[in-house]
């Protein structure tokens, strides 16, 4: 029997419902329970795949190829469960499925309404996503009071009636602000948020109160009194330097035990030693390395959320504080590579469109010519190949057909056919819809013997997640190999280039996939760990060069 924990948010958005849900999931998992997490998004887009990163932040790709909310990345980083397309759905997806059923005649000519048809579809999708788990944590996107969230809130209200309070539990995340002028913590926004939630039939069982500082006992008691929530169930969650401290903070306040008690679950004590080690390693680095992330969405760092977390994970596993310098590739086009001179390593992430491309190409050239560790992910690999073709293979005006359809040397072109990991041949062509038509999800990759990639992974076959429409053009790859480009990874059917490197460079790696999606704080990822180690080595080498003249003078 699956128990359901519904997490809602009030007062303001961006309080951290996703991280709170994931942290509770980590606690319950450490108590011996099988956990999964779902995210319900109230927007009308079918999925976030075609949404601007400036609007939505990162699109997280699951193993089965779904384009989902970035919160699913938090879920996978905190718990051991692998998310699928069933773990995230939107209002748009729900309505599309209901309308499809209506057109098919499934409702036998009935009038289709929000209640019961939309709410029934939401409940069915929640049950489907939760199937097989001891506990399903269901995060409802948006803020209580938003009109968009009402169908979801109504659906979970109905689930409480249908399943009872031994199988369902409501957690409400809310803000308790500190008003500096008055020198007081204000509980009124939380009181009103709970009042709004109760007005639609939901009484929270547990409150998680977000604040700048830990909540004093007096305010905790006041909140309990006015919201009809027992005082031990009012949890204080203040700001922390690292999100990986949150499972420990919530465990220490007894949240996991409180949940198990309310849901009548017999569970063991939560063993969070792994999280203690992560936090200790993050708080006590022995080294520092500066990494430039050269992209076009740098004004919103959530656009690269999994990427920044993967770099942090690599720092944890190398005892290194990773300083991330986000650099707009258009700024490099305007001001040149001077912006890169103080960094120890350069990373160019994925992206779409021609804006800022030449700045990224300049960054790859700067890294190649100056022996600086370079990590190109997805588009970052493609622009490294474009730069190499132009400079080393004398392919003037080489480009991707994404940016220049008439380029004389299309070293990167639309991928029209590939074999998925199930052995199925998938095809795409010009003019296809943008949504859901990319090469998506986990795909197997065969690594070249004696390559850097093979040494980093420690195995000859890996599965990594993809999200792209364009690939290296096999018709031109032979010429690039003659000039020193190493194809260190290929698709399992040998049709597609998955990884590249340069043999005469200290550390120059490109991959067509997105390794950041599978990095976790407890394990890291071999490519990111190798990249940070290379950055440290480059930093030490630079120090040695700078110290050499003064050493000679001393001699």
From Swiss-Prot:
Sequence positions that bind ATP: 14-19, 71
One biological process term in Gene Ontology: 'de novo' CTP biosynthetic process
Binding annotation for Mg(2+): 71, 139
InterPro entries: Class_I_gatase-like, CTP_synthase, CTP_synthase_N, GATASE, GATase1_CTP_Synthase, P-loop_NTPase
Keyword hit for Magnesium: yes
Keyword Signal among record annotations: no
UniProt note on regulation of activity: Allosterically activated by GTP, when glutamine is the substrate; GTP has no effect on the reaction when ammonia is the substrate. The allosteric effector GTP functions by stabilizing the protein conformation that binds the tetrahedral intermediate(s) formed during glutamine hydrolysis. Inhibited by the product CTP, via allosteric rather than competitive inhibition.
Pfam families reported for this sequence: CTP_synth_N (PF06418), GATase (PF00117)
EC number: 6.3.4.2
Pathway where it operates: Pyrimidine metabolism; CTP biosynthesis via de novo pathway; CTP from UDP: step 2/2
Residues that, per the record, bind CTP: 13, 146-148, 186-191, 222
Key words, A-Z: ATP-binding, Glutamine amidotransferase, Ligase, Magnesium, Metal-binding, Nucleotide-binding, Pyrimidine biosynthesis
GO terms under cellular component: cytosol
PROSITE patterns to which the protein is assigned, alphabetical: GATASE_TYPE_1
Binding residues annotated for UTP, in chain numbering: 13, 186-191, 222
Domain called Glutamine amidotransferase type-1: residue spans: 290-541
GO MF entry, a single one: ATP binding
Active site positions, chain numbering: 378, 514, 516
Top-rank taxon: Bacteria
Function statement: Catalyzes the ATP-dependent amination of UTP to CTP with either L-glutamine or ammonia as the source of nitrogen. Regulates intracellular CTP levels through interactions with the four ribonucleotide triphosphates.
Other remarks in the entry: CTPSs have evolved a hybrid strategy for distinguishing between UTP and CTP. The overlapping regions of the product feedback inhibitory and substrate sites recognize a common feature in both compounds, the triphosphate moiety. To differentiate isosteric substrate and product pyrimidine rings, an additional pocket far from the expected kinase/ligase catalytic site, specifically recognizes the cytosine and ribose portions of the product inhibitor.
NCBIfam families: PRK05380.1, PyrG
HAMAP family cross-referenced by the UniProt entry: PyrG (MF_01227)
Name by which UniProt lists this protein: CTP synthase
Lineage per the UniProt record: Bacteria, Pseudomonadati, Pseudomonadota, Gammaproteobacteria, Legionellales
């Amino acid at each position: 029997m699956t128990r359901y924990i519904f997490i809602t948010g009030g007062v303001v958005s961006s309080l951290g419902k996703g991280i709170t849900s994931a942290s509770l999931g980590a606690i319950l998992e450490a108590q011996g329970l099988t956990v999964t997490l779902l995210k319900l998004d109230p927007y009308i887009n079918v999925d976030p795949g075609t949404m601007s990163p400036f609007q939505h932040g990162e699109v997280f790709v699951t193993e089965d190829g779904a384009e989902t909310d970035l919160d699913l990345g938090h879920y996978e980083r905190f718990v051991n469960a692998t998310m699928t397309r069933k773990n995230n759905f939107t209002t748009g997806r729900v309505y599309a499925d209901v309308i499809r059923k209506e057109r098919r005649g499934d409702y036998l000519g009935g009038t289709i309404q929000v209640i019961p048809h939309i709410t029934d579809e939401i409940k069915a999708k929640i049950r489907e996503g939760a199937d097989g788990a001891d506990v399903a944590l269901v995060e409802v996107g948006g803020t209580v009071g938003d009109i968009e969230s009402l169908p979801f809130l109504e659906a979970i209200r109905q689930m409480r009636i249908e399943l009872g309070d031994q199988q369902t539990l409501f957690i409400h995340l809310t803000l308790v602000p500190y008003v500096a002028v008055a020198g007081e913590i204000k509980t009124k926004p939380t009181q009103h948020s709970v009042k709004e939630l109760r007005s639609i039939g939901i009484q929270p069982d547990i409150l998680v109160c977000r604040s700048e500082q830990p909540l004093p006992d007096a305010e905790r008691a006041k909140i309990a009194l006015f919201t009809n929530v027992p005082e031990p169930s009012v949890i204080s969650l203040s700001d922390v330097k690292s999100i990986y401290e949150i499972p420990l903070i919530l465990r220490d306040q007894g949240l996991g035990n409180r949940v198990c008690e309310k849901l009548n679950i017999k569970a063991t004590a939560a063993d969070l030693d792994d999280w203690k080690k992560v936090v200790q390693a993050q708080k006590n680095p022995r080294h520092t390395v500066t990494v430039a992330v050269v992209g076009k969405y740098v004004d919103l760092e959530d656009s690269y959320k999994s990427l920044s977390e993967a770099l942090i994970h690599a720092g944890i596993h190398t005892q290194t504080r990773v300083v991330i310098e986000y650099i707009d590739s258009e700024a490099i086009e305007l001001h040149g590579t001077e912006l890169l001179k103080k960094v120890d390593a350069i990373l160019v992430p994925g992206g779409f469109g021609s804006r800022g491309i030449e700045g990224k190409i300049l960054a790859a050239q700067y890294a190649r010519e100056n022996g600086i560790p370079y990590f190109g992910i997805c588009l970052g690999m493609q622009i490294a190949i474009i730069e190499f073709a132009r400079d080393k293979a004398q392919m003037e005006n080489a480009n991707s057909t994404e940016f220049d359809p008439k380029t004389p040397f299309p070293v990167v072109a639309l991928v029209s056919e590939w074999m998925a990991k199930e052995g199925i041949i998938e095809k795409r062509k010009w003019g296809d819809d943008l949504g859901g038509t990319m090469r998506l999800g986990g795909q197997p990759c065969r690594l070249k013997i004696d390559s850097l990639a093979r040494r980093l992974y420690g195995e000859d076959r890996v599965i990594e997640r993809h999200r792209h429409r364009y690939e290296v053009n096999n018709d031109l790859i032979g010429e690039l190999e003659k000039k020193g480009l190493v194809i260190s990874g290929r698709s399992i059917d040998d049709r597609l280039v998955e990884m590249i490197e340069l043999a005469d460079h200290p550390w120059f790696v490109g991959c067509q996939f997105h390794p950041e999606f599978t990095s976790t704080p407890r394990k890291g990822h071999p490519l990111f760990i190798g990249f940070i180690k290379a950055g440290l080595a480059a930093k030490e080498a630079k120090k040695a060069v700078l110290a050499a003249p003064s050493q000679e003078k001393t001699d």
